[in-house]
Amino acid sequence: MKKRFIFITGGVVSSLGKGITTAALAAVLEARNLNVTIIKLDPYINIDPGTISPEQHGEVFVTEDGAETDLDLGHYERFIRTKMTRKNNFTTGSIYSEVLNKERKGEYLGATIQIIPHITNTIKKRIISCAHNVDIVFVEVGGTVGDIESLPFLEAIRQIAIDIGRENTIYIHLTLVPYISITKEIKTKPTQHSVKELLSIGIQPDILICRSQYTIPIQARSKIALFCNVLKESVISLINVDSIYKIPKLLNLQKVDQIICHHFKLKVPPADLSEWDEVIYNELNTNNVVTIGIIGKYIKSPDAYKSVIEALKHGGIKNKTVVKIKLINSEKIEKNGTNRLNCLHGILIPGGFGHRGITGKLITVEYARINNVPFFGICLGMQIALIEFFRNVIGLKDANSTEFSQNCQHPIISLIPKGNRNLPNINNNVKKKLGGTMRLGNQTCYLKQDSISHKLYGKNIISERHRHRYEVNNKFINKIEKYGLKITGKSKKNKLVEIIELSNHLWFIACQFHPEFTSTPRDGHPLFIDFIKAAIQYKKIKQK
């Protein structure tokens, strides 16, 4: 199969939405019956984002095969049907690590190791390895053109055009075209300088996607085309929109997919964007509004809970409901009480690590349980729900997790037992390092047939993604059924608790896995869809 690559770079400033633009463009080409995939190149020195603070870098997106990756891979999976793997995201750190390991083993036969060719060849090899059985590979280069960290990646993608032919590569450059409100002018100079910087590296962009507050007029586009040496029709205006799911249509209307297919000489049908039209229709034609509270400790950066936020919106789309999301600091609940929870129609506690903010989360679970507020616990959220239940319902006041109190009398939650660590991606050497030491990726879960979860999924066996190193201590689970808390999902051979449900409650479900990673705007996810449905019901009850 012929190898074709589209390389996407960014200029002027960061945070232009390069990942979303890449994903949306891939979605349009997928809608033309093309098989596409996307790679993200991250220029930081970390091996992966697994140990980076969510407040700095946003969430860690977990793939089916257990890779801890950049949050942009979440955007990719939400826009296209292709599932990402560990091959779809790599960092400068992982490249250097691979090269240095080979050098230590003597695989370079005594050669002096250099950026060119050793680092760039390793980058090229990884990129090209993703081109099997796909029509087009999109490659998003992280960072901004001009950053020193991105130079090896840019050099590698420059060389790929030489290796496989310019006719099999397209370079797309995403830039900012600012609007100056005082003079009421759109300024093209930053884009010109950004392209000049890219040209100095040896890359001539074929398409310019210009991010702007307003539609860029034809005159300004013609000027950009002239000074940046691109065709006028290849200067694309991408304005700010109220929904990212409108972007595929915006790109299609400006015939970006047609330009790409013409360059690659691909004879494919027009893009069928009917599924995206349905998503937008459901977003615009809503019947309800609900407010969902996400209770966490990384609320300064909404990107820390990106997939959860998007999954809640998907649940809203499927219920034709506007979902308003409040990010609430659990530490403030601990200090100031539960008043700020009174306006919520549903409460969600997402995954997390460490003891900070735990007391506020325990207070929140108790509030939701007592007041019949729909509650959804994910990963740590399930563990918190169990600790609260053991303390306040069963009466084990010292119930805790060994993550928060190593010597607690009743360790309801503890490290995954050694006997269960023969699962994929588990590293037994937890104390010596943090990176790559968790139960990661897709794991099988067996559902109890008379449960809500079984009804929602419509099957006996499911597979969901995990990211945790602590689990429910099986020594204590026999006590909970008689108090009304049901274990409705377990891992293979009943080793680990995966889902719990509270009886006699409007909606109280918690799971050890991360369902947000598999939710999409076109399909949603059964747990999130039903959670929003319960929030709508709770709002109606509350209004009576």
UniProtKB/Swiss-Prot annotation:
Record flagged with keyword tRNA processing: no
Annotated metabolic or biological route of this protein: Pyrimidine metabolism; CTP biosynthesis via de novo pathway; CTP from UDP: step 2/2
UniProt cross-references to NCBIfam families, sorted A to Z: PRK05380.1, PyrG
EC number annotated for this UniProt entry: 6.3.4.2
Recorded GO CC terms: cytosol
Residues binding L-glutamine: G352, L380, G381, M382, Q383, E403, R469
Binding site for CTP: S14, D147, I148, E149, K187, T188, K189, P190, T191, Q192, K223
The protein's role, per its UniProt record: Catalyzes the ATP-dependent amination of UTP to CTP with either L-glutamine or ammonia as the source of nitrogen. Regulates intracellular CTP levels through interactions with the four ribonucleotide triphosphates.
Reactions catalysed, as given in the entry: UTP + L-glutamine + ATP + H2O = CTP + L-glutamate + ADP + phosphate + 2 H(+); L-glutamine + H2O = L-glutamate + NH4(+); UTP + NH4(+) + ATP = CTP + ADP + phosphate + 2 H(+)
One GO-annotated biological process of the protein: 'de novo' CTP biosynthetic process
Region (Amidoligase domain): 1-266
Protein name: CTP synthase
Gene of this entry: pyrG
EC supergroup of this enzyme: ligase
UniProt cross-references to SUPFAM superfamilies, sorted A to Z: Class I glutamine amidotransferase-like, P-loop containing nucleoside triphosphate hydrolases
GO function terms (MF aspect): ATP binding; CTP synthase activity; glutaminase activity; identical protein binding; metal ion binding
Residue sites binding UTP per the record: S14, K187, T188, K189, P190, T191, Q192, K223
Quaternary assembly: Homotetramer.
Stretches assigned to the Glutamine amidotransferase type-1 domain: 291-541
Entry's family note: Belongs to the CTP synthase family.
Annotated residues for binding of Mg(2+): D72, E140
Keywords of the record: ATP-binding, Glutamine amidotransferase, Ligase, Magnesium, Metal-binding, Nucleotide-binding, Pyrimidine biosynthesis
